[in-house]
């Protein structure tokens, strides 16, 4: 922009790491930009410069493999390798490695250089967490994964910072409540922006079929539940194309049997 730009942010900042990632990437290409205070971002007049740029793999997408490792770990089968991820990633959802560490998943990086893309190994260890408490204000896209995984591992939880989940691709709070109930878990959203599970169960559907609400993350967060519910059906599986179009193919490579409707 010839005259630059000043942005004034209002209200509570949600998903702050995405703003920080954008600023860092702009600076990589020569932008003169400053986050001056909590609510003001200044972009000065400055053309972008051209140079090569490595695009790291998606830590958000890796969350579903962490979930698989955690659920398979109870069968001593949880060993997964992911490629082209950085230990020092600027992606906010790279926090998934810390979240799942309390669920018994050890993350090992093949390279000791924090800014070097490398192979990541996930190894399941014993989990003795009595209750999972976490504020998702900076990583709301990971909430569905942790809700499903925590329930299936029988770990009560209290998750906060979820106020934006109601205005995502769908109302993810209502969607989670409805679909987890099909699997026999009763969630509590009586406090706005929070979701709890205190261990309350109900009778699961005999042959559960998960609705995805045109939401890619509903499909991918619930897919690993087939480890506990063999034959689990996922309706409208094509929704994964928004962020992870090869998700089902990658599950096949990992040994999961995927049967499409046309094959019934």
Language-model features: locations:
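Short, structured segments at the rim of ligand-binding sites
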Residues: 1-264
């Amino acid at each position: 922009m010839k005259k630059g730009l000043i942005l004034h942010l209002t209200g509570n900042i949600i998903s702050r790491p995405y703003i920080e990632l954008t600023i860092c990437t702009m600076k990589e290409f020569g932008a003169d930009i400053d986050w001056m205070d909590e609510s003001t971002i200044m972009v000065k007049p400055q053309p972008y410069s051209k140079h090569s740029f490595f695009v790291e793999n998606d830590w958000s997408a890796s969350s579903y493999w962490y979930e698989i490792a955690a659920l398979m770990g109870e069968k001593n089968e949880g060993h997964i390798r992911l490629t082209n991820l950085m230990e020092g990633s600027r992606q906010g959802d790279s926090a998934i490695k810390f979240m799942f560490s309390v669920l018994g998943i050890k993350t090992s990086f093949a390279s000791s250089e924090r800014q070097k893309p490398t192979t990541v190994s996930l190894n399941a260890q014993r989990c003795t967490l009595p209750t999972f408490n976490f504020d998702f204000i900076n990583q709301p896209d990971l909430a569905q994964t942790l809700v499903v995984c925590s329930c299936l591992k029988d770990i009560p939880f209290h998750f906060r910072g979820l106020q934006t989940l109601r205005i995502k691709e769908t109302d993810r709070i209502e969607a989670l409540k409805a679909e987890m109930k099909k699997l026999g878990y009763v969630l509590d959203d009586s406090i706005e922006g929070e979701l709890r599970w205190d261990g309350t169960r109900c009778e699961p559907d005999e042959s559960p079929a998960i609705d995805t609400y045109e939401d890619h993350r509903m499909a991918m967060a619930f897919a690993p539940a087939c480890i506990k519910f063999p034959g689990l059906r996922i309706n409208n599986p094509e929704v994964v194309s928004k962020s992870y179009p090869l998700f089902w193919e990658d599950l096949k490579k990992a040994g999961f049997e995927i049967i499409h409707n046309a094959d019934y």
